[in-house]
Design a protein with these regions (language model features):
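Phosphate-bearing ligand-interacting subdomains
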Residues: 210-233
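Short active-site-adjacent structural elements
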Residues: 178, 201-203, 227-232, 252-255
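Short beta->alpha linker loops
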Residues: 42-44, 145, 174, 224
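C-terminal accessory "lid"/substrate-recognition subdomains
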Residues: 86-218
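Hydrophobic residues at beta-strand termini and immediately following loops
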Residues: 39, 81, 143, 193, ...
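Short, flexible loop segments at boundaries between secondary-structure elements
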Residues: 196-200, 238-256
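Phosphate/Mg2+-binding loops and adjacent switch elements
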Residues: 2-135
């Protein structure tokens, strides 16, 4: 869809695309994975028709947030559920966060438990399988978020050990707790600043944040927030300080 973008309609990512045009998450995919095509469009069916009638027809289209999309019947459906808030323990709106009955899980070809704290714990994974009770046609995977080494914004160089004496960790994502925990693990002192999800940073709020910090401070953010800062021309605010983002990858493990 391109949530948070300032445009409408079908757009194919290109060399000149920005987060304002595509949305921050599609823009991040576009920058990180140069060998894939990225498209946004609020009308999924119309967008797919444009893609498959185009000159560069893909073998596979991955549609974000498409499990409950009524206008497109995907040939392979992936259901994500979080370790801390599994659908098996949730309820329908407004009592809980589910948009349909739990029984709707039967449509999934693949179920992924995200944020699994220890993907090597077979006993814990077996307990999850008993809770989900996957059907014969369903595969189950357990995923874990893995943080990479901090990447400098390009101003003052980071220390070779990538640890921080003082850190200001700032993020405009939905659930920043894991990010703050990661920064805390490599910092002696940390100040946490949380913004709303998909927040469009204002130059003045960033200037104030930098001005109020000590000379020993390192500013740390997420890769998604870095993309917004870069596309909005705000990286110059950090040119005379140490600033970096922490990339993530997702590790998948099969069910036991």
């Amino acid at each position: 869809r391109g949530y948070g973008r300032k445009t409408k309609g079908f757009i194919a990512a290109s060399a000149g695309s920005t987060a304002a045009e595509l949305g921050d998450e599609p823009m991040m995919y576009h920058l990180r994975f140069a060998d894939i095509q990225v498209y946004v469009g609020e009308n999924r069916a119309a967008a797919l028709e444009r893609i498959f009638n185009g000159s560069n027809v893909p073998d596979v289209v991955v549609m974000d947030d498409g499990y409950q999309h009524r206008g497109v019947d995907a040939s392979f459906k992936i259901l994500l559920t979080t370790f801390n808030d599994p659908f098996t323990a949730d309820y329908l709106l407004p009592a809980g966060g589910l948009r349909e009955s739990k029984s709707g899980y039967w449509r999934a070809d693949c179920i992924v438990i995200t944020g699994f704290p220890d993907a090597q714990d077979d006993q814990e994974r077996k307990r999850w399988l008993e809770s989900i009770q996957p059907l014969p046609h369903q595969q189950v995977f357990f995923s874990k978020m893995v943080y990479g080494d901090a990447v400098s914004f390009g101003g003052k160089e980071l220390g070779s050990d990538r640890t921080f004496t003082n850190a200001v960790a700032f993020a405009g994502i939905a659930n920043p707790a894991a990010f703050f925990k990661q920064v805390n693990s490599c910092s002696e002192n940390i100040t946490e600043i949380s913004f709303p999800d998909h927040h469009n940073f204002l130059r003045q709020e960033l200037v104030s944040m930098v001005a109020n910090a000590s000379d020993q401070t390192t500013f740390v953010t997420t890769e998604k927030d870095f993309v917004r800062l870069k596309c909005n021309g705000l990286l110059d605010v950090f040119q005379n300080v140490r600033a970096c983002y922490i990339p993530i990858t997702i590790r998948l493990n099969d069910a036991p």
